[in-house]
Regions:
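Sec-dependent signal peptide recognition
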Residues: 1-7
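Aromatic- and Gly/Pro-enriched helix-to-coil junctions and flexible linker segments
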Residues: 9-128
Length: 128
């Protein structure tokens, strides 16, 4: 019995955030155009603490170098293994669903069941 209690109390190592999964699944969401909203990169490439690399004019995707810089920035707004404590997921989530009260870019997801929110949560939880 004591062994089970020990395991439950032992600190868990957070999952490692995977760059390739980020580039394949997360970064495209930052470039996605949503009805009634600007793409994340439009606002987050200037004037915010969450600063993404500007997308070069005429480009639809980032170079690997720019993606790595974005990955390093995004990691600052994520608590690996804890999507419910990660600002990347909470800022654009509706307040009624547990998101922050305000996000200047609007609320992109009404619930945690939104496929985009789930994609981000899966990545934060160590998914590939």
């Amino acid at each position: 019995m004591w062994f089970i209690v020990f395991l439950l109390l032992w600190p868990q190592t957070p999952p490692e955030l995977d760059f390739n999964a980020y580039r394949a699944h997360v970064e495209p969401l930052l470039l996605e155009k949503r009805p009634g909203h600007a793409r994340c990169v439009v606002c987050h490439s200037t004037g915010t603490a969450f600063r993404l690399q500007p997308l070069p004019k005429g480009q639809a995707a980032y170079s690997e170098e720019a993606s790595r810089k974005n990955f390093d920035m995004v990691k600052k707004f994520v608590r690996a293994g804890h999507p419910d404590e990660s600002r990347l997921l909470l800022m654009p989530l509706a307040h009624e669903a547990g998101g922050t009260e305000f996000h200047p870019g609007g609320k992109h997801w009404e619930t945690r069941d939104d496929p985009e929110w789930k994609t981000l949560a899966d990545w934060v939880n160590g998914g590939r």
